Amino acid sequence: SYSMEHFRWGKPMGRKRRPIKVYPNSFEDESVENMGPEL
């Protein structure tokens, strides 16, 4: 799960990491489980 998310959002979010605030309703749940340890 983590490796897949990291590969998908690792590139676009690695630099921006801002879109998470644009639509937290959709990423909040995934961000906490998948990107939780990264953030």
UniProtKB/Swiss-Prot annotation:
Modified residues (Methionine amide): M13
Domain of life (superkingdom): Eukaryota
Keywords: Amidation, Cleavage on pair of basic residues, Hormone, Secreted
Biological process according to GO: neuropeptide signaling pathway
Cleaved signal peptide residues: none
Subcellular location: Secreted
GO molecular function: neuropeptide hormone activity
GO cellular component terms attached to this protein's record: extracellular region
Function: Precursor protein for pituitary hormones that regulate stress and environmental adaptation.
Family under the similarity heading: Belongs to the POMC family.
Name the UniProt record assigns to this protein: Pro-opiomelanocortin
